[in-house]
């Protein structure tokens, strides 16, 4: 019996190594022991981890005020003041609502008659005016998962193409498969005007990429628990699904809506017919877009249920030459600064004359490609010199002139030796 007592005294916690006599209680398992102190420590660690996870997934982040969001957008996006204001307020209200629901909890809101509905956003405006960039910048400021989807790739369930649930898979992937984090993210759906009904009156033929897609999007826009295939593609009954609640996902849908200005003008009585009809002007069209009503969107081809789930409607305007020049130089990550940084990595300075910047902006206006076309023009102008510079150690500075843009003339090259002599003489 003595031996049994001695062996009992030698029992130790498998985690901290303390003996049975040093702790209040020792819990035995199959070949292992754990003391009460280690159990308490484990509980504290678990509580801390759960608190951190709750903080990340329930919106307990620092929510910037609308003016702060607007200021951040102002650093990156030139112009579009009305759109930036509308987005700042809408995004602030959305995440304020998410935080309120997460803090109070759905169980405690049952008796409360006030339930704040979700306000998704519709962005209307021509291509290359910053619609996608606005949404990306918002997600960057809020540090939430962000996914971009193309509405033209979507089809109604059962037809060749992508199901609407694949949009949610992109958001889950952006959140590194953290579903809880994805459920408070932002989804940007572009080219939504391309899924407008092909005719104003419903047709007896199936419109699988138009009205059918709008119908399929209704539930996830409003808020539902969707079954998402983890590998994408079509659903089949024998696969497992990821369950995603879209109640707190903010949807920003956008499109160019070409021809919508005519519908608005006709409704408002601003458009003539025949030889007396006024010619289209971009500035006039921009003003007309600001007067859009739900009935105009319905006439364009969006179904009333779809319009009703997009209560915040804002517009972006065509960028003029002055705005394009500012985009080249003013934002924090301006295109000119990006290329100057790339040249610096090769030990070369890059300089643009004022005339060159004006010509680049003029070319973008002429091509009607907006801000998106600026990078393509810069690549055309800088491509040949970027090919030569890495192999030429004598180049110290490259100056882009108006002729470099307009006439494809070679830029002005300043040798490194000349720059050194100028520095010494100074």
Swiss-Prot record:
Keywords linked to the UniProt accession: ATP-binding, Chaperone, Metal-binding, Nucleotide-binding, Zinc
Disulphide-bonded residues: none
Among InterPro entries, the record links this protein to:
AAA+_ATPase, ATP-dep_Clp_protease_ClpX, ATPase_AAA_core, Clp_ATPase_C, Clp_protease_ATP-bd_su_ClpX, ClpX_bact, P-loop_NTPase, Znf_CppX_C4
What CDD domains does this protein map onto? Answer: RecA-like_ClpX
- What are its GO biological-process terms? cell division; proteolysis involved in protein catabolic process
Per UniProt, where does Zn(2+) bind?
13, 16, 35, 38
Might you report a single GO cellular component term? HslUV protease complex
Please give the SUPFAM superfamilies that the UniProt record associates with this protein: Glucocorticoid receptor-like (DNA-binding domain), P-loop containing nucleoside triphosphate hydrolases
GO molecular function annotation: ATP binding; ATP hydrolysis activity; ATP-dependent protein folding chaperone; protein dimerization activity; unfolded protein binding; zinc ion binding
Stretches assigned to the ClpX-type ZB domain: 1-54
Residues reported to bind ATP: 126-133
> What family, per the record?
Belongs to the ClpX chaperone family.
The cross-references to PANTHER family, in alphabetical order and at most eight, read: ATP-DEPENDENT CLP PROTEASE ATP-BINDING SUBUNIT CLPX-LIKE, MITOCHONDRIAL (PTHR48102:SF7), ATP-DEPENDENT CLP PROTEASE ATP-BINDING SUBUNIT CLPX-LIKE, MITOCHONDRIAL-RELATED (PTHR48102)
The UniProt entry, under HAMAP family, shows: ClpX
Q: What is its quaternary makeup?
A: Component of the ClpX-ClpP complex. Forms a hexameric ring that, in the presence of ATP, binds to fourteen ClpP subunits assembled into a disk-like structure with a central cavity, resembling the structure of eukaryotic proteasomes.
User: What does this protein's UniProt record list under function?
Assistant: ATP-dependent specificity component of the Clp protease. It directs the protease to specific substrates. Can perform chaperone functions in the absence of ClpP.
Stated name of the protein: ATP-dependent Clp protease ATP-binding subunit ClpX
Species: Clavibacter michiganensis subsp. michiganensis (strain NCPPB 382)
